[in-house]
Amino acid sequence: MDKERISYHESVQKMYERIKKDNMTNVWDRYEAQGIGGVPDRRCTFCMAGARCDLCSNGPCRSDAAKDKRGVCGITADGMAMRMMLLRNVMGASTYHYHTDQTIRTLRETAKGKTPYSIREPEKLRTFAGRLGIETLGSDSEIALYLCEFVEKDFNRPAYEPSRIVEILAPPERKKRWEELDIFPGGIYGEMMLSTSSCLTNVDGYYASLALKAMRLGIAMAYQSQIVNEYCQDILFGIPKPHTMRVDLGVLDPEYVNVLPNGHEPFLGFAMVQLARKPEWQEKAKAAGAKGLRVIASIETGQEMIQRWEEDDAFYGFTGNWISQEAVLASGSVDLFAADMNCSLPVAPLYAEKYGFKLMPVSELIAFEDITERLNYNPVEAGRQAAKLLNMAVENFKNRKNSGEPVLNLPVKEAVVGFSTESILDALGGTLDPLLDAIKSGAIKGVVGMVSCTTLRDYGQDVHSVAVVKELIKRNILVLSLGCGNGAMQVAGLCSPETREFAGDSLKAVCEALGVPPVLSYGTCTDTGRLADFLGAISAVMGVPIPDLPIAAAAPEYMEQKATIDAIFALALGLYTYVNPVPTVTGAPDLVKLLTEDCREVTGGVLNVEKDAVKAVDGIEQHIMEKRKKLGI
């Protein structure tokens, strides 16, 4: 594979050489092997078009819209493609909400004094509870318990009973439109049941109906799962505030005991950092022959952590996003890999055996072949669980050192991380006016929320995302980066002050005046809800509906099921939404037309699909300029 087809990052390119030398299975070779006729991106044409189904025993079926060839049950190509998309959406929503459920569980036990955590942001607790109409006169613990009770009651509302959380948090104009479309949601559990049941054979085969149900589920997910999750994590672990963080694979020093919490849930990661910062744990590592003990942030668990807590010698840095995982594990510097929900590769046991690290599932969702030992997260036991994990890592240090030579001299960069609604307001002096003035004057043409994964489809890891974002800031468009795409920006150096040199003159001047980079590190994919709430605030201050603002969403390298429901929610919110790779719906012409054209008249949002980075940004910029013209700015 060419270097650019492997990754944008030199560190990962170098580690690929090590992996190949060691004859290890890896994501790049596996991707190439899936290609047809020696072309990595060429796959089954029916699968790529979304025109196939294997849900019942009459199948598998293939469909062809041009010939009106339907499934045995009679479903059209459009119905097939949208039904499978909705099932992906359900998986994404369910996984997002599993995280939320664990966060509420953790907040409740913390309020009872049973965890190693504390309520770090009592003001945020009271502000958020107050927004939801919860009594705020009691103690922090009492309010936290009221909050847990309130949100769980809302989660459990049936689909036919409107969600109070959505009613309170969503912008009035959006609520009105959703009610008109009959997509105002009930509780998230009821919505998941409604969507899943609709996908049964011979139930709902109408693509437009299925698309509306997907939007309804997306709205429930964003406001109930994502916003509640992130705001409650803020309450527990701190509101993100800007600070520098070491990033890239060079944060792994083989002379230290290195512990990597990996996945999407940061609970045990935070607990381990609290312990690792204590002198006695550093002494334990030194007694084992190491220079010390470090917790290294990885993927979205790591992203949750680095947004909130500052670096030091115990909480040392961040490796990268999910495609970097095998590169990290093959570095010869990992002692323990704690795998929570999401983004832990099934091949990890092979790497653990080869490179001598301890692989430990810490979520009931995660399982690996031939790995029998596990430590499922329990907030009441979190302190003891974190200590056990650190002990495992220390005890494994000598085994890892004897398992082969580590890779040295990998790069380390610095990124500015930790932007949130609150910290952006702080940077602006407590009001949105400076940002809005910059937009009105044209110094900032518009804002793009880049919520993305990373994928090998069409390009190497992060290559397309970096190209799109560089082109956006060159055209004076401010970028808020989220998800694995945020990790891409950090490791690529685009979240540092030096990035201003890539920005257009007017955006560069604004960023210099505010002391920020033109790419603001805004969190994980779960922060999509936080971003929606921020856009709602901008809409309220400007008195302009969200669909009429000079803003857009972009997912240059979406990959999995969470990403699909983020995109569907963006359409429901009324956003111009750019995605790549091409979704598996091209064999569904009516569905394609609905998403890429007709949706403008439905919600105000529209989907744009484009492989070329410059053409993609052309479309985004054209949309932004049309909105500016309509607003007279």
Swiss-Prot record:
Residue numbers binding [Ni-4Fe-5S] cluster: 264, 343, 453, 484, 525
Q: Which reaction does this enzyme catalyse, per its entry? A: CO + 2 oxidized [2Fe-2S]-[ferredoxin] + H2O = 2 reduced [2Fe-2S]-[ferredoxin] + CO2 + 2 H(+)
Residues involved in [4Fe-4S] cluster 1 binding: 44
Q: What is this protein's function per UniProt?
A: CODH oxidizes carbon monoxide coupled, via CooF, to the reduction of a hydrogen cation by a hydrogenase (possibly CooH).
How this chain assembles, per its entry, is: Homodimer.
Listed InterPro entries: CO_DH_a-bundle, CODH, HCP/CODH, Prismane-like_a/b-sand, Prismane-like_sf
Which cofactors is this protein said to need? [4Fe-4S] cluster; [Ni-4Fe-5S] cluster
Protein name per its UniProtKB record: Carbon monoxide dehydrogenase 2
What family classification does the UniProt entry report for this protein? Belongs to the Ni-containing carbon monoxide dehydrogenase family.
Gene Ontology biological-process entries: generation of precursor metabolites and energy; nitric oxide catabolic process; response to hydrogen peroxide
Q: Which cysteines are joined by disulfide bonds?
A: none
Q: Which UniProt keywords apply?
A: 4Fe-4S, Iron, Iron-sulfur, Metal-binding, Nickel, Oxidoreductase
Top enzyme class, one word, equals oxidoreductase
State its Enzyme Commission number(s).
1.2.7.4
Q: What is known of its domains?
A: Cluster B is an all-cysteinyl-liganded 4Fe-4S cluster; cluster C is a mixed Ni-Fe-S cluster which is the active site of CO oxidation. Cluster D is also an all-cysteinyl-liganded 4Fe-4S cluster that bridges the two subunits of the CODH dimer.
UniProt source species: Methanosarcina acetivorans (strain ATCC 35395 / DSM 2834 / JCM 12185 / C2A)
Q: Does the keyword 4Fe-4S apply?
A: yes
Q: Which domain of life is it from?
A: Archaea
Q: Fetch the PANTHER family from UniProt.
A: CARBON MONOXIDE DEHYDROGENASE, HYDROXYLAMINE REDUCTASE
Q: Relay the cofactor remark from the entry.
A: Binds 3 [4Fe-4S] clusters per homodimer. Binds 2 [Ni-4Fe-5S] clusters per homodimer.
